[in-house]
From Swiss-Prot:
Residues reported in the UniProt entry to bind ATP: 69, 125-131
Pathway(s) annotated for this protein in UniProt: Carbohydrate metabolism; galactose metabolism
PANTHER family for this protein: GALACTOKINASE-RELATED, MEVALONATE KINASE/GALACTOKINASE
Name this polypeptide is given: Galactokinase
Annotated organism of origin: Aliivibrio fischeri (strain MJ11) (Vibrio fischeri)
Amino acid sequence: MTNLIKNVKDAFNSVLSYAPTHILQAPGRVNLIGEHTDYNDGFVLPCAINYQTVVAAAKRDDNIVRVVSVDYGNETDEFDITQEITFQENKMWSNYIRGVVKCLIGRGYEFKGADISVSGNVPQGAGLSSSAALEVVIGQTFKELYNLDISQAEIALNGQQAENEFVGCNCGIMDQMISAEGNENHAMLLDCRSLETTAVSMPEDMSVVIINSNKKRGLVDSEYNTRREQCEEAARIFGVKALRDVTIEEFNAKAHELDEMVAKRARHVITENDRTEEAAKVLASGDMKRMAVLMAESHASMRDDFEITVSEVDTLVDIVKNVIGAEGGVRMTGGGFGGCIVALVPPMLVDEVKAAVEELYEAKTGLKESIYVCQATNGAGLVL
């Protein structure tokens, strides 16, 4: 993060010609287990990772917000918070910032302008929530600059609202919530219905290894919508609000009445919820052998019942599994059809995992992976 801090400070100084008063950060995240459970009112178990979006900021006396994007060649954006805040077709990055500010005002918070420079190293397009980190760090910035009486949960909800309503991208609450509320060496069990969060301690020094298959993700939107409709249909047949309310026993008793495809989708969600709740318990007790089993079962369920993995991702999981055995867990993470796998790896096996993936993955698939070795880190806050 030191480089990011230097970059935002330098950009602030050179473009705005004075020094910032505050440095803030918000992290990206990875979901350890609990896939496609969020929109079924279920449970997820993400952790924040030490790839961040960092902001240098200072208050202004007027109502202007000026933003410098270091990652877009110090491109700037400027808007007046007393005027209508509008969507910018030609500066997509600035819409996340405009949206967050607009939603804060809409929620009744009062503040004046700010000068902001921003840079991040959360890999984009890898499903590690670079957009949520940006939304959360901007909310955090106005909280700190103006001592706003806003909770971390509300900063997260405000970011989600900005993405849904202003940017126009439909997302659940997980990404913003873990970015706002993460804890070092902890994952977070999030109940997507009540939004209740529980910090879950992780074995000390456990590496969180994220490997991007770099398989271009096709069909994501249409397939995602189909899965969602199938889950809603299953919930209707069971007469419940969401699949969260169906036990595996209830499912087994009625599965024969469901369309075969709908039954497979529902079985994934119902068993994944059970796995996620159990994973929170076994992770906290340091039982990595059981965690390994749960992550393997999660992957198999995504592959066979939810049918969202692809051969490249399955190959990556197998390569890592062969190295770590029962010492750690590995599975696909994210929406599916490409994207990343996540592995919990004891530190002494990290180099071996990297070597195996580098030797075998490209040879088997023709694609070159990207590897990120992370630790579970703190959520958003002041750095300086």
